């Protein structure tokens, strides 16, 4: 009787495993495999760097891989539980689940922009990948998504893994910099600090609703931002998180 019950339990377990197999674990880290796994989950690998060898700080991670939103993010996120449950911070919650799963698969630990204080040094990490640069308006620009940067997390490795060499010039070098003149209230402009107060005040007006529904004018003006394939719905969600109290 006990053996029959055990066999039944084993059959149930095998059936459950077939329907919901555990994530594949990669004992030997492959950047290409990580890139593919991130893409399948709705993310892109935005850059990687050997941090410890650059800083000489023993407590720093040996390798950091930054993952963020790309063209496949919105269709996957918007149909996820987090994207539909109406609870606060849906993108952060989705990111921690997805990036956490990637970390389990590739034997990494994680860091998130929402962690803190103290906050992980995402800007420093990003600039060390040689795929992020400072734009004329002061915010970072990326080689494939322009000013539409949304880093969702970092995978941290305690050993140096093989990563692609990135020796790129800033996309701003040969650009006419429309980002510096597009903001209707000059909150983002060349050679000046970001005027956060002016930005938020504008978003409270009827004129500012195009930014709320489609995204920041300056970010959209960047020619490279087209590579992010942002939908208006995604931009609106990010803008609502940035400015939750719009009162046009």
Predicted features along the sequence, with ranges:
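Extreme N-terminal basic, low-complexity initiation segments
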Residues: 2-9
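Non-ligating segments of multi-cofactor redox enzymes
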Residues: 27-248
């Amino acid at each position: 009787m006990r053996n029959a019950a055990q066999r039944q339990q084993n059959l149930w377990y095998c059936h459950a495993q077939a329907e919901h197999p555990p994530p594949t674990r990669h004992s030997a880290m492959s950047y290409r495999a990580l890139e593919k796994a991130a893409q399948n989950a709705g993310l892109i690998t935005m850059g990687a760097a050997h941090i410890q060898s650059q800083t000489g700080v023993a407590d720093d991670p040996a390798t950091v891989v930054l993952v963020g939103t790309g063209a496949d993010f919105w269709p996957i996120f918007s149909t996820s539980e987090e994207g539909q449950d109406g609870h606060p911070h849906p993108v952060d919650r989705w990111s921690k689940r997805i990036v956490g799963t990637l970390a389990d698969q590739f034997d990494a630990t994680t860091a998130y922009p929402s962690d803190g204080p103290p906050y992980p040094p995402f800007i420093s990490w990003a600039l060390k990948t040689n795929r992020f640069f400072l734009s004329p308006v002061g915010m970072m620009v990326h080689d494939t998504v322009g000013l539409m940067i949304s880093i969702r997390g970092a995978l941290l490795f305690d050993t140096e893994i093989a990563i692609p060499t990135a020796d790129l010039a800033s996309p701003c070098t040969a650009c006419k910099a429309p980002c510096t003149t597009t903001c209707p209230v000059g909150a983002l402009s060349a050679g000046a600090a970001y005027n956060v107060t002016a930005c938020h005040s504008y978003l409270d007006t009827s004129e500012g609703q195009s930014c709320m529904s489609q995204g920041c004018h300056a970010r959209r003006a960047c020619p490279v931002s087209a590579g992010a394939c942002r939908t208006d719905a995604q931009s609106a969600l990010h803008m609502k998180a940035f400015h939750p109290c719009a009162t046009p």
